[in-house]
Amino acid sequence: MPVITLPDGSQRHYDHAVSPMDVALDIGPGLAKACIAGRVNGELVDACDLIENDAQLSIITAKDEEGLEIIRHSCAHLLGHAIKQLWPHTKMAIGPVIDNGFYYDVDLDRTLTQEDVEALEKRMHELAEKNYDVIKKKVSWHAARETFANRGESYKVSILDENIAHDDKPGLYFHEEYVDMCRGPHVPNMRFCHHFKLMKTAGAYWRGDSNNKMLQRIYGTAWADKKALNAYLQRLEEAAKRDHRKIGKQLDLYHMQEEAPGMVFWHNDGWTIFRELEVFVRSKLKEYQYQEVKGPFMMDRVLWEKTGHWDNYKDAMFTTSSENREYCIKPMNCPGHVQIFNQGLKSYRDLPLRMAEFGSCHRNEPSGSLHGLMRVRGFTQDDAHIFCTEEQIRDEVNGCIRLVYDMYSTFGFEKIVVKLSTRPEKRIGSDEMWDRAEADLAVALEENNIPFEYQLGEGAFYGPKIEFTLYDCLDRAWQCGTVQLDFSLPSRLSASYVGEDNERKVPVMIHRAILGSMERFIGILTEEFAGFFPTWLAPVQVVIMNITDSQSEYVNELTQKLSNAGIRVKADLRNEKIGFKIREHTLRRVPYMLVCGDKEVESGKVAVRTRRGKDLGSMDVNEVIEKLQQEIRSRSLKQLEE
């Protein structure tokens, strides 16, 4: 009979099989009421599943991350319950959990309108408020197939036929008259599923294959309580205000058009931001002793066959032909960097060799996945490749980590989650090589006092990697930085150096990206700052305005003086009211507005205002220039009044 060990080390002895709910009730009615599921020997199970042998048990509640995920999964089933009541002939496909919520793909003989979605959400609330029990039954494969075949659920039958072994026992979850199939676990009662909202609908092909039928995907969000739901909806509202596509149009940064899907047309102000980012990155490359190179954007298909990209990546590559040769427009920079490394004999004394490029890359992303600057087809990578010996890996990774944090801190990103992906089952190289490589990455992180979590088995077949995910002001995650070891590509492309023993050896290659795609990072920054770029990055840093025509000459003199001081400045001499000008440039998020009236001309000063509406009063021109230069030079995130 089972002995149940709880997280605090205490044990409970039973003379019969028990469920997590039984144990929770044994501990106390409060825990039983909060119990959503259990974790038995590390595996999530339903609250009703029986434990027959000795086991470690944790009770899962809505306060746990897993508990929230279960709530969201059960809300997907609730959606299925509601839609079958409203439109009984609907065929249900799949309804998984996603970040912050869930979705369900359905085959429906009508296109859902906003009114339909509102009616569906209303029915979901009506059902959830009944607080009915969710009943789980484990049945044979044949019984499950018969259940769904009798209900006309052809997609569920297809899942059973193609994805579930005949000797398996699928879990069926009954929501009153509605039944769904899932591995689980799910909530034991719908009282846990009161705080949700349906968000939008979209099209989705069955099994993600464009040859299959287009289904309707209904997205929803779900949370453990009303406060969390409202906070999330408020974040979404704020995110909509910060949408880089909207701000990009308002500030005239860039545009995109149908004739070039996923390609960016940079306007002057947007390109100014892009070039400032390049200047910043170049300054760091120099500080961390990188060479900057430039490879061709198109190379013969034969080279991509050697690297393995053609076999594994060709659908995402653009190709063209000339003189009976097929060329691939590069989706990444690494093969070109190996070609540069291969020019001339290399010695161990030449290593490490750090090679960086602002590489123009193209990937044939599906048109439906394109999203402003965040997901494009043509982009510029700020990546680099380090060629080194195995003994140099730790020091080089250390340098990469310092560079990552050095650059992210400049933009004010403080919350960074780090993951270390280890060896997969299918891999190249010896266990000893992987042992050392993984240890080098882990020690480098530890030496920099960086907490991290392992992603076991998630590394590439050619080496382990570190991923850096930064979180913005709305707590959204953006995976940008990577440090990836590669034991394969240098060998495939015949890279070598002469070792200390005079023998030819294959270098280790470290792929290093920090910003990732420059376009995407500008999109991230646009939303992070809501268009209020720090002064050093702002396309126009200062606008100087006159009140009447009599100050025009003074404004022009000051404009030239600030420009000569390296400040991006414009003069606004339009015959408009000063209040109108200030409002317009405030909406354009120009960091500083200098106003010149007769008093300023007489005193040789300027009246200084910020885009946040702060009046800094009258200041000496040279003082303004000196303070602005300091703010720009230091790449400060704060303005003068802060």
Curated annotation (Swiss-Prot):
A GO cellular component annotation in the UniProt record:
cytosol
Cofactor binding note: Binds 1 zinc ion per subunit.
Q: Return the broad EC class.
A: ligase
Q: What is its EC number?
A: 6.1.1.3
Which UniProt keywords are given for this protein, alphabetically ordered? Answer: Acetylation, Aminoacyl-tRNA synthetase, ATP-binding, Cytoplasm, Ligase, Metal-binding, Nucleotide-binding, Protein biosynthesis, RNA-binding, tRNA-binding, Zinc
The molecular function GO annotations come to:
ATP binding; metal ion binding; threonine-tRNA ligase activity; tRNA binding
> Which reaction does this enzyme catalyse, per its entry?
tRNA(Thr) + L-threonine + ATP = L-threonyl-tRNA(Thr) + AMP + diphosphate + H(+)
- Region annotation (Catalytic) ranges: 243-534
Superkingdom as given in the UniProt entry:
Bacteria
- Output the Pfam families linked to this UniProt entry: HGTP_anticodon, TGS, tRNA-synt_2b, tRNA_SAD
Q: Where is the TGS domain?
A: 1-61
Task: Identify the SUPFAM superfamilies for this entry.
Answer: Class II aaRS ABD-related (SSF52954), Class II aaRS and biotin synthetases (SSF55681), TGS-like (SSF81271), ThrRS/AlaRS common domain (SSF55186)
Q: Give the matching PROSITE patterns.
A: AA_TRNA_LIGASE_II, TGS
UniProt: Zn(2+) binding residues: C334, H385, H511
Its cofactor is:
Zn(2+)
Q: Where in the cell is it found?
A: Cytoplasm
Q: Which residues carry this modification: N6-acetyllysine?
A: K286
Give the matching HAMAP family.
Thr_tRNA_synth
Which family, according to the similarity comment? Belongs to the class-II aminoacyl-tRNA synthetase family.
Function, as annotated, reads: Catalyzes the attachment of threonine to tRNA(Thr) in a two-step reaction: L-threonine is first activated by ATP to form Thr-AMP and then transferred to the acceptor end of tRNA(Thr). Also edits incorrectly charged L-seryl-tRNA(Thr).
Q: How does it assemble?
A: Homodimer.
What is this protein called in UniProt? Threonine--tRNA ligase
Provide the gene name from the record.
thrS
